[in-house]
Amino acid sequence: VLSPADKTNVKAAWGKVGAHAGZYGAEALERMFLSFPTTKTYFPHFDLSHGSAZVKGHGKKVAKALSBAVZHLDDMPNALSALSBLHAHKLRVBPVBFKLLNHCLLVTLAABFPSZFTPAVHASVDKFLASVSTVLTSKYR
């Protein structure tokens, strides 16, 4: 459960990402594909090379979902319900892969915002991403 301080930290961190969220989403995806090659199996039809339009496009989708979650911190299950259905029933993404992407998102934010990504912000964003993952995997059962 996110505390009031966590919510403040998440909103502030995501506010820094701002209009460039899609770029950071794509950077995190590229990082994930390089670090955890098994995650590429969900994207056999994508050009996964650095800077590809498909990775950038999916990065925007990831960023949009996270922006929706930030806007609905108190009601993420409803805000992400359709996305949860998609990942559980159609795409059948391994729940572990959400943790891998979360890690890559944290690394991306820490690398791109070193002074703003304090230990407290890191902890709050980590809790937020874990909450998003829990929501996205809730319909697997």
UniProtKB/Swiss-Prot annotation:
Residue span, Globin domain: 1-141
Function statement: Involved in oxygen transport from the lung to the various peripheral tissues.
Protein source organism: Pan troglodytes
Family designation: Belongs to the globin family.
A GO CC term assigned to this protein in UniProt: hemoglobin complex
Lineage start: Eukaryota, Metazoa, Chordata, Craniata, Vertebrata
Protein name: Hemoglobin subunit alpha-3
Keywords attached to this entry: Heme, Iron, Metal-binding, Oxygen transport, Transport
Keyword Secreted recorded: no
InterPro entries named among the record's database cross-references: Globin, Globin-like_sf, Globin/Proto, Hemoglobin_a-typ, Hemoglobin_oxygen_transport, Hemoglobin_pi
